[in-house]
């Protein structure tokens, strides 16, 4: 099935000052910030942050879960189970393979806007949340963003989480703040912060068993006996991004209910 993105999901909302947005793009281009000059990239990030789960096809097909697959990626392990059934049976709402750090220059006010929202809606913060994945502080008050996020070019998730009141109000707050255009907010930190605060830790899952490559990084399961000696995976664990200093997977494993992969 193929569909078109509704025009209103890929255009400027009425409250955005397009001259100010253009000035931001020019400054970011001069500063050599990745995608800093791109107008289309910003529309893409806003769409993936706030509208993909509202696409008419997702309703027409009666979808409850989704798997984001981008052009040019490689799956390097046999997927011999149904990830959607796994998510449903284990009450998972968000799954990922790779995590990394965001470029701070692209999101100067994303965290402060998040704190404003959390202060306004403390009841939305999950009781057993994964806050420590996105901040090194012990409480949200006075905290800073540690820049960790799930790399959203691979996501398996529950559409009902994104369609829920908590997430939609969070996105609406961010959208009105204008940072998708006045800065260069990505959908990865938006999804990651939302999942870490609005979901319980047990609802987030690292798909270690799925080898995945999206240039320039890859995730490859480390257990050779379980995944490689039997030919299940074709990747090299030595090339996995998991143990790179720029990866946040080790932090996630320390917080997750499953712990580090065996």
How should each PLM-predicted stretch be described?
Residues 1-63:
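Active-site-proximal specificity loops/subdomain of glycosyltransferases
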Residues 59, 73-234:
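Catalytic core and acceptor-binding pocket of nucleotide-sugar-dependent glycosyltransferases
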């Amino acid at each position: 099935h193929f569909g078109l993105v509704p025009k209103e999901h890929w255009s400027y909302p009425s409250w955005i000052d397009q001259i100010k947005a253009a000035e931001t793009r020019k400054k970011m281009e001069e500063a050599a910030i990745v995608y800093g000059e791109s107008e289309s990239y910003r529309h893409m990030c806003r769409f993936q942050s706030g509208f993909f789960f509202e696409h008419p096809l997702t309703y027409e097909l009666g979808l409850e879960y989704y798997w984001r697959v981008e052009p040019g990626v490689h799956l390097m392990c046999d997927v011999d189970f149904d990830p959607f059934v796994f998510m449903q049976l284990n009450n998972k709402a968000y799954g990922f393979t790779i995590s990394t750090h965001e470029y701070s220059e692209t999101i100067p006010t994303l965290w402060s806007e998040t704190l404003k929202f959390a202060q306004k809606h403390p009841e939305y913060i999950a009781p057993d949340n994964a806050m420590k994945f996105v901040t090194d502080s012990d409480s949200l008050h006075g905290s800073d963003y540690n820049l960790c996020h799930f790399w959203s070019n691979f996501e398996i998730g529950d559409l009902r989480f994104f369609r829920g009141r908590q997430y939609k109000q969070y996105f609406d707050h961010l959208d009105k703040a204008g940072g998708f255009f006045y800065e260069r907010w990505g959908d990865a930190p938006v999804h990651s912060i939302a999942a870490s605060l609005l979901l319980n830790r047990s609802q987030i899952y690292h798909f270690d068993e799925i080898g995945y490559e999206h240039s320039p990084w890859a995730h490859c399961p480390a257990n050779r006996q379980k995944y490689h000696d039997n030919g299940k995976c074709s990747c090299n664990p030595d090339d996995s991004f998991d143990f790179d200093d720029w990866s946040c997977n080790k932090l996630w494993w320390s917080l997750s209910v499953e712990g580090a992969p065996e």
